[in-house]
A protein has these predicted regions:
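Conserved N-terminal phosphate-binding loop of PLP-dependent enzymes in the Aspartate aminotransferase
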Residues: 1-304
Length: 304
């Protein structure tokens, strides 16, 4: 259906490529679909997943200055160790992966990391510097780090801390969104509601690069003319693909499919683990975002 929509619009409607500043009905339809599926107030279309996280980062900073009234140039964004948000300068500034950071410094200031899934470390940092922290920006389930699923009570406790200290909960759903974990968005598995999310990858239905940021009105509205832009974000064909990707997610019940098939896959993983306990240390995951960890460390580095 997504491919058919692309062919139709290319052949019949001959869609041009126009910058996001030029409004058109296709982008309006995409923004409406994206706000509906996310339950957020507003959406900003982008192209790549890294772009969506980069804009999330910028929006959190701007909200910190304009809404929370953090002193100029003192805003802090907190991330988690083992994170992966892309390979832009802001993303590698937050990364603790030496392969991503090597010879790309100096890095952006105003970033601090806490161990992932460590509520005590986060609480300590919030208590020490909460008045200057704008956001905790993090993956609901860490992907690149090895499909790290946090404890069941982690995210509810994080949300309580964020509300207590007036800190945004910003989630990177680029890898985890669009049904992959058994829910439309992974945060829904943990019964929390982030203030802003970044989406990409499957948002383009496997056809075109499509991404977006969805958030609360008070965050998105900090953008002003000239403060943000995109040549290809939300251009007509990408908007068509975005609409049909969301339609496919809902109509084909892809989240439910991932949940059912994920259980089958995890059962197979556990069978293999039971057969080779000396080789497989652990199985873990949610839906079809799954992994098994080997005992032998020489098999753990996917880059080698």
């Amino acid at each position: 259906e997504i491919v058919d929509a692309v062919i139709h619009h290319l052949q019949k409607e001959k869609l041009p490529t126009v910058p996001r500043s030029i409004r058109h009905k296709y982008m309006s339809a995409f923004l409406l679909a994206a706000t509906s599926i996310t339950g957020m107030d507003k959406v900003v279309p982008k192209v790549s997943g890294a772009e969506s996280w980069e804009l999330t980062f910028k929006l959190c900073r701007r909200w910190g200055y304009q809404v929370k009234q953090i002193p100029e140039n003192e805003c802090i964004i907190v991330g988690a160790t083992g994170n992966f948000h892309g390979r832009t300068l802001a993303a590698v500034s937050m990364s603790d992966d030496p392969d991503s950071r090597g010879d790309f410094g100096p890095f952006l200031p105003g970033i601090e990391l806490v161990p992932y899934n460590d509520i005590d470390a986060l609480k300590k940092l919030f208590e020490e510097k909460g008045d200057k922290i704008a956001a905790y920006s993090v993956e609901p389930i860490q992907g690149e780090a090895g499909v790290i699923v946090p404890d069941d009570d982690y995210w509810p406790e994080v949300q309580k801390l964020c509300k207590k200290h007036n800190i945004l909960l910003a989630m990177d759903e680029v890898q985890t969104g669009f049904g992959r974990t058994g829910a439309n968005f992974a945060y829904q598995l943990f019964n929390v509601q982030p203030d802003i999310i970044g989406c990409g990858k499957a948002a383009g239905g496997g056809i075109l690069p499509v991404s977006f940021v969805a958030g609360k009105k008070e965050i998105i509205d900090t953008l002003t003319p000239g403060s943000e832009g995109s040549t290809f974000g939300g251009y007509p064909l990408a908007s068509v693909v975005g609409v049909y990707a969301i339609k496919t997610l809902v109509d084909l019940k892809l989240a439910e499919n991932a949940r059912v098939r994920g259980k089958l896959l995890m059962n197979h993983f556990n069978d293999i683990k039971n057969e080779f306990p000396d080789k497989i240390k652990e199985t873990r995951g949610k839906g079809l975002l799954t992994a098994f960890e080997m005992h032998d460390e020489k098999h753990l580095d996917g880059h080698k």
